[in-house]
Every structure is written in C-alpha cells, then in structure tokens.
C-alpha cells in the first residue's frame, strides 16, 4: 500500500479537532502519515494534538508560530513523505473510505490529481457540491476547459506529491482565497486528472470561521490580487487566449457575482460593490455571450441583471420573501 500524507492545519478548533482527526484515523485505508500543524493556536489545540499523537503512532505534530492557513499547510507539506498528499481542514471531517477510493482511482489512472465531490454543511443542513466534468476517465485542462470552473478547494483533491512539489505552487501566505490562488495553476500544470463523482468530504460552514467573518477591505484586496496572479500566470504561459472564456467567467463569478450578492444582502452602501464592479470591467471584456453565463439558471440570471442595473432593493426583497417561506415551512 502506498503511503498517504494527510496535512491538517490546526488553529482555534478545540470543539472540532477530535472529530476531524478521528475521521482520518478510522479510514478504511490505513497506510497514513497524519501531520497536525499547530499554527500557534492560543487555546488547548496544541495539547490536544500531542494527546492525539500518543493514541496513534501515525500522527506527528508540528508546533509553529501563527502564520495563517497557507503557512500551516506549506509547513505540513515540507514534512510529508507519502506518495500522495491530502489536505483536511481541522473543523471539517471526511467520509470513512475517502482515502481508499481516491488512492484506488489515482493508482488506476496514474493521476497527478484526483478530484471528488463534497458535502457543504451549514446549520446542520447537508448539500452535495458537485461539478460538471466527466468522471471515470483521465482528463486534463487542455481536454476539459471547464475544469477551471470546478470548486477550487484544496481539500477536495488528492495530489500525487511528486507532481505537487514539481508544480512549485505553494499557498500564498497572508492572503484569503488561497485555494483559488493555486488550483487553477495546478490544473494548468497537471497532465492527468481524474474525477470521482461522489461526495467524500464534509465541509462545515461556521459563523465564526475565517471566511464568514472576513473583513471586506482585505477580502476585496486579496480576491483581486489572487485573480490578477492567475491571469498573469496564464498569460506568461501563453494560455490566456486558449482559456479566455473560462478565465473571464472566473473573474466575473469570483470578483463580481458572488461577492456582490453577499454585499447587497448585508446592506453595503455601495463602496465595495463599486470596487468589485470597476475591477471586473477593467479585467474582462463583454461577457454577455459567455457560454457559461448562458447556462445559468433563471434565478442567477435575474441576480446578475439586478447587479448590473443596481436594483439592489429587489434582491433584498426576494431574499426576505425566501426566508419568510422557509420559516413557514
């Protein structure tokens, strides 16, 4: 059996850490190297990591000064020795046979990366997040351009560690959206990718998590820096025109559509809405005929119309109506 290195960044997750590590230790695939990276957590997380390591010899603990999620992941990768590499966030947990299924797929297809679906859990409600790419065969970005539209989460992928190291794409320290900053680069460099159309990971959305409590000034700055980096890498590699439609969609979705919806519902006075609007206009041309936008649901097309014509009151009204209906049900 091939060794799999599982990197788990740990910071202020006392309530969730044991559940996370237990789900890894109890995998049906047992050839694991579990690396817990205590990122200077001010609570008992460091002690808990040591206690967990005493119970399972496959666990090793790295204590370091706080440097953020990206820095913790990068530090864990440096310690990894397995053929394969998996990231698990410490407030999440994984399906019992995730590693077994992902490794079997990687070995069968000789892949650089294996993608899989996941459960998004918010307020106890589970929703499967999937993507529209073919499964059961070897693919690449060159063959499947819409890979660029797949969820960027690093934890929804198993990496061949040799490929990961050669790609030389560490997570950017100090920035939000570290997965968005790196995944499109991995897709560009990977020659063999496979996709398991099955949810194997539980992603937990918490009210006080990094992203739900994000600062809008830093969030907008980091989002734009990350997207500019992606566009720059594709241009440097002579691939911008090849993937123009996907890259323009990536900018529209990440720097305009999604953050603008959030800001409207939060009652933003227009400062950050205009910031995202100006950025998007400066980076992409006319996307009205973008094939991916044309595939949107009527609801998303309506939301885009609302944003384009600044009819924010209508989006707030629709959101309020949905909440009222949901409460009655």
Residue ranges and their predicted role:
Residues 2-5, 23, 33, 181:
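Cell-envelope/extracellular polymer assembly enzymes that use nucleotide-activated donors
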Residues 12-26:
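Short, well-formed alpha-helical segments that are part of the catalytic scaffolds
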Residues 38-48, 65:
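A conserved acidic beta->alpha catalytic loop
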Residues 64-80:
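Glycine-rich, basic loop-to-helix element that forms the pyrophosphate-binding segment
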Residues 69, 90-194, 204-218:
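Donor-binding/catalytic cores of nucleotide-activated saccharide
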Residues 85:
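Short aromatic/hydrophobic "clamp" motif used to bind/position activated sugar donors
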Residues 265-329:
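Membrane-interface aromatic/basic loop that binds lipid-linked glycans or pyrophosphate carriers
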């Amino acid at each position: 059996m091939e060794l799999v290195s599982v990197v788990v960044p740990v910071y202020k997750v006392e309530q969730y850490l044991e559940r996370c590590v237990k789900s890894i230790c109890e995998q049906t695939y047992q050839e694991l190297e579990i690396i817990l990276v205590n990122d200077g957590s001010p609570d008992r997380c460091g002690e808990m990591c040591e206690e967990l390591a005493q119970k399972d010899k496959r666990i090793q603990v790295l204590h370091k000064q706080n440097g953020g999620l990206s820095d913790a992941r990068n530090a864990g990768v440096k310690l990894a020795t397995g053929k394969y590499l998996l990231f698990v966030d410490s407030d999440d947990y994984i399906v019992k046979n995730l590693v077994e299924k992902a490794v079997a797929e990687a070995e069968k297809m000789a892949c650089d990366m294996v993608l899989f679906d996941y459960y998004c859990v918010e307020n106890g409600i589970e929703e499967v997040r999937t993507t529209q790419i073919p499964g059961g065969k070897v693919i690449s970005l060159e063959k499947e351009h819409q890979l660029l539209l797949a969820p960027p989460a690093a934890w929804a992928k198993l990496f061949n560690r040799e490929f990961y190291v050669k790609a030389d794409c560490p997570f950017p320290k100090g920035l939000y959206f570290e997965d968005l900053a790196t995944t499109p680069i991995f897709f560009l460099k990977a020659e063999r990718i496979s996709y398991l159309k099955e949810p194997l990971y539980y992603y937990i959305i918490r009210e006080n998590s990094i992203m739900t409590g994000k600062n809008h000034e830093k969030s907008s700055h980091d989002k734009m820096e990350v997207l500019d980096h992606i566009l720059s890498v594709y241009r440097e590699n002579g691939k911008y025109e090849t993937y123009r439609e996907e890259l323009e969609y990536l900018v529209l979705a990440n720097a305009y559509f999604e953050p603008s919806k959030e800001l409207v519902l939060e009652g933003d006075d227009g400062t950050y809405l205009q910031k995202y609007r100006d950025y998007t206009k400066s980076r992409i041309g006319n996307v009205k005929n973008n094939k991916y936008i044309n595939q949107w649901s009527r609801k998303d097309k309506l939301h885009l119309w609302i944003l384009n014509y600044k009819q924010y009151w209508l989006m707030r009204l629709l959101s309020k109506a949905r909440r009222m209906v949901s409460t009655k049900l």
